[in-house]
């Protein structure tokens, strides 16, 4: 496993150096080259970026900034962080990135118990935050995806009763809140809703 990790690390560091303005400059300033990685421990010699650096470089130069490693025309999707700690940071995705993301999500859903005969409600928002397209991972697995998103609780309860999903993805606090609203509205979870797996 470590041999594979080392091989992938070497490839990634070389790719970053050869294809991004930021990492080439950062490595050169630190006096390191991709060829300096001979073991996994050698990663400690290389400079790391943080959120502050991401924000400072994301709009310098090209549209996606100095850290983007592909031309803008290869980007087919972009998302941003939530912005809870400052200016949102941008994540550009190529078609290959997007496909790998969906494959990864399908595997994660499978590990969480989702199967092709499941009905899945995505109860998180579909704004610029990267969570939205996870739904496609459920579809890739073969499950029925019900694209609800961030709707009022009354509407989500209607969807849960009407379409009887077997899986819902939302935050733990909102799942609790939804249960409280369901009680207030006179729903009986045992009778009105199927047994839900909460992801």
Question: Can you say where each PLM-predicted feature lies in the sequence?
Answer:
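Conserved AMP-binding loop of ANL adenylate-forming enzymes
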Residues: 106-143
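Conserved ATP-dependent adenylate/AMP-binding module captured primarily in the ANL superfamily
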Residues: 44, 101-119, 153-165
């Amino acid at each position: 496993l470590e041999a594979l990790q080392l091989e992938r690390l070497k490839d990634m560091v070389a790719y970053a150096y050869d294809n991004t303005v930021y990492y080439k400059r950062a490595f050169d300033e630190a006096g390191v080259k991709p060829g300096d990685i001979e073991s996994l421990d050698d990663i400690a010699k290389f400079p790391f970026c943080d959120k502050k650096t991401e924000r400072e470089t994301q709009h310098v130069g090209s549209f996606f900034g100095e850290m983007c490693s592909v031309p803008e025309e290869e980007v087919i999707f972009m998302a941003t962080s939530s912005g809870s700690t400052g200016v949102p940071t941008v994540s550009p995705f190529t078609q290959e990135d997007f496909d790998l993301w969906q494959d990864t999500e399908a595997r994660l859903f499978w590990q969480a118990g989702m199967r092709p005969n499941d009905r899945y409600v995505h109860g998180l928002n579909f704004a610029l935050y990267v969570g939205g397209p996870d739904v496609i991972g459920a579809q890739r697995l073969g499950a029925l995806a019900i694209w609800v998103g961030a709707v009022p609780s009354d509407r989500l309860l209607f969807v849960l009763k009407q379409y009887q999903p077997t899986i819902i993805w939302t935050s733990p606090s909102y799942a609790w809140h939804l249960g409280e609203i369901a009680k207030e509205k006179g729903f009986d979870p045992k009778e009105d809703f199927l047994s839900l797996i909460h992801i």
